[in-house]
Amino acid sequence: MRLVHGKDAVNALDVSWLSPILVRDPTSPSESAWDLFATFMRTRTMKSTATNMNQHPTTAQICRRFATRLFRGTVSIRPLTLTLGCLAASASASLVAQETATNAAASQADAISKCPVMGNPAGPNRHTVSGAMGNGDWWPNQLNLDMLHQNSVKSNPMGEDFDYAAAFNSLDLAAVKADIKELMNTSQDWWPSDYGHYGPLFIRMAWHSAGTYRVSDGRGGASDGTQRFAPLNSWPDNANLDKARRLLWPIKQKYGSKISWADLMVLTGNCALEDMGFETFGFAGGREDVWEPQKDVYWGPETEWLGDKRYSGDRDLQNPLAAVQMGLIYVNPEGPNGKPDPIAAAKDIRETFGRMAMNDEETVALIAGGHTFGKAHGAASPDGNMGVEPEGEGLAAQGLGWINTHGTGNAGDTITSGLEGAWTSTPAEWSHGYFENLFGYEWKLVKSPAGAWQWTPTDENAKGTVPDAHDASKSHAPMMFTTDLALRMDPEYGKISRRFHDNPEQFEKAFAKAWYKLTHRDMGPVSRLLGDSVPEPQLWQDPIPEATFDVIGSKEIEQLKQKILATNLTSSQLVSTAWASASTFRNSDMRGGANGARIRLAPQKDWEVNEPAELASVLTTLEGVQKEFNASRKDGKQVSMADLIVLGGCAGVEAAAMKAGHAIQVPFTPGRTDATQEMTDVESFEPLKPIADGFRNYQGHNADRPAEEMLVDKANLLSLTAPEMTVLVGGMRALDTNAGAGPLADLGKLTKRPGALTNDFFVNLLDMNTVWKQSPMCEHFFEGRDRESGNLKWTASRVDLVFGSNSQLRGIAEVYASEDAKEKFVKDFVNAWTKVMNLDRFDVNDSESTETQVAAK
């Protein structure tokens, strides 16, 4: 999706290309060179660069002299600082190009255009802006592997060794909260607070940070602070939240690296609720910031704001999307596509909130609780009054957007959603006024000053019951959105709303728990949560019990591996079962994984991809090993099924490596425990069900994308790099782990030695004596025939062939197909395997894993 920092913002600065540049600078810049650059920058402080060039003719000479030293290598400079300085100069050079076009000083204009620092090619035809033509423009169906390499340490200013958990734990959280609450009660002239309190604005900020989460793929949410970056920082639904974050900057600046933006936004939302009289359920830190826009999140097919091409048929919403329109967090408050129909709006609300992991009661509680505070802003039409979003603004705006020219541009003249007014008579205090007004009045349809549909009481006595946000001499009637009326008019929502109206304590408890779920849903298990305000584990956090026994040691590990290998289970069965257990993990919301051994439980035990009958047989055999071992121990040591399943996979890999001529020890860290069915929300786990698993050459029946794209998507959720994904696929094919029987079992099995951990998959895939053609059996299957005889040699899937077709993946495959790569292949496979097995081991440091050792037999 290139809508914000692509098509609609072709001049948006693209700094992603800086990541490969090393930031280590062993020398210092010469003072004279820096004097030149400083002089150049000082001369650019006047009204425009063009005027500056007229008044200071030596500027171009200074620029050229500095650039000459740079390119001759006599200036040594930290690349990031230099590049940003040059890019800032280049960006403002657009003014130079425009203003010097008619300037009589043609020689000076020519000097500017040729200057290596300020030269400005016409149009977005340069690699430093996102609108430049790239590979994706030439070949739009090219496999996008960038998502596998996002969030590199090279883009992270904190460095590889920064320990955020330790930094957060050193924080005086009470002092932070006190500072936040003081800030909320101190209005700033540049963006005055409504009702003298920034709390409602901060609740919206926290809500919209968390509200992008969708349960289908676990992406979105508050856990990485991406509201700071495109596209979220420029979504229409996030209008003026740039001001909320700027208001918070003094707090962030004071505490620095001890609290991330991601944590600060959620904590501030909690503080806002508390300072306005509501008792929250809890708060946990531990959200670590990312430092770049995320490339793995699909936000929709639209190319314009508020488009709804995501729907088909009878309003069928495309997966994995949850919001109804491009640029909205949830639903359109005016109703579907702006049509004020509360019943139709209820349908959208139910689907959208459901896709964000909320049931009907949680949905009503969240909407009603959130709308107890603050107001909507629609003082005038945005047309002609509202500037562009932050990503489309110029340099002088310094990252702010939606600049408002109506009246004062803020306070009573604020334009945000276009709807106008407050829901209750105490917008800066917790109350039960929302339901009192919702059921206490009859409502009629009106338009806001901005022209948006909203509802006002038919009772004239309602006028004057709501104070003005800024002028004590004014008052208003309450208002409701179409989506608010849906909570009264929809039969199911109506029942819940009336119950909450009649039982305020139930409403308060439901809102507190729903708010906690909303803001913590994507943080994973309780073991990842930091701070002393973390409540007891909730069912939606997929709880795992604490160990009530001593874990096994190295001696017992070796004994158990021998016992497992002595059963009738093959390496393929052991590896497949361990992979099925561990590969449910999603790095997006930290759910799934091998800990808990939920592969034994519904729904995972019944998923088609896990081949239920085969799985049941393997688990029964492993349970026998577990029972025998545990019964024999007198020292308190026990082995869980979660550990035994993973250990079985490790033993299978070792045996397969030995079969290929390599002795290797696969690292294994015990300590997993077994969850129960009562600890497992079946409905909540269904979205973890793989639609496709390219590592097992499995393709489900409801795929919405080519199999190779779904492989990359799964690899991203497993936090794998392209080389790790490649070596795992090659190894899994050699180990004969395909899901399915008959022809499916042989797809991609490009080896005459199945079950041996060889690099045969890559060797045979890249063999030029084989010609590949689509199979008559299925468009997703291919046949590899001998180039001369035409005899069938292999069958393969789209996933298999992409490693020879995609130039980047082929380059990696060539490494593993080389004669000198046999040992490297085994070692790299084991390292990637161990990574996947431990993805959910948040209780284990990376340093606790042993180094993989491999030797020829």
UniProtKB/Swiss-Prot annotation:
One of its GO terms (cellular component) is cytosol. Signal peptide: none annotated. Its cofactor is heme b. The keyword Signal does not apply. Its EC number is 1.11.1.21. There is a cross-link at W207-Y330 (Tryptophyl-tyrosyl-methioninium (Trp-Tyr) (with M-356)). There is a cross-link at Y330-M356 (Tryptophyl-tyrosyl-methioninium (Tyr-Met) (with W-207)). It comes from the Bacteria. The record marks R204 as: Transition state stabilizer. Bifunctional enzyme with both catalase and broad-spectrum peroxidase activity. NCBIfam families: cat_per_HPI (TIGR00198), PRK15061.1 (NF011635). Homodimer or homotetramer. This is Catalase-peroxidase. The lineage of its organism: Bacteria, Pseudomonadati, Planctomycetota, Planctomycetia, Pirellulales. The gene is katG.
